[in-house]
UniProtKB/Swiss-Prot annotation:
This protein's name: Large ribosomal subunit protein bL27
Keywords, in A-Z order: Ribonucleoprotein, Ribosomal protein
Region (Disordered): 1-23
A GO cellular component entry from the record: cytosolic large ribosomal subunit
GO BP term (any one): translation
PANTHER family xrefs: LARGE RIBOSOMAL SUBUNIT PROTEIN BL27M, RIBOSOMAL PROTEIN L27
Superkingdom: Bacteria
Keyword S-adenosyl-L-methionine appears in the UniProt entry: no
Entry GO MF terms: structural constituent of ribosome
Biased composition range(s): Polar residues: 7-19
Length: 88
């Protein structure tokens, strides 16, 4: 017979790391080409003028310029980058 009580186990004790999603550059901010503007899952924000979309739906600047957030139809949002002189 055991003289020590065996320790039980638990089914908890796990947690995942945060994914660090969200807007990284806000409207009016100056960005360099290749800068990440939004990290997202799915297309909450759609790419607009001079903005590319990566395989994980990350939006990034294709040119140096100023970030603008715009409406896209009803309820949609898009992100564009315009050259610093002609920001909309």
């Amino acid at each position: 017979m055991a003289h020590k009580k065996g320790t039980g186990s638990t089914r908890n004790g796990r947690d995942s790391n945060a994914q660090r999603l969200g807007v990284k550059k806000f409207g009016g901010e100056v960005v360099r080409s290749g800068s990440i503007i939004v990290r997202q899952r799915g297309t909450k924000f759609h790419p607009g003028v001079n903005v590319g979309r990566g395989g994980d739906d990350t939006l990034f600047a294709l040119i140096d310029g100023v970030v603008t957030f715009e409406r896209k139809g009803k309820g949609g949002k898009k992100v564009s980058v315009y050259p610093a002189g002609e920001a909309a």
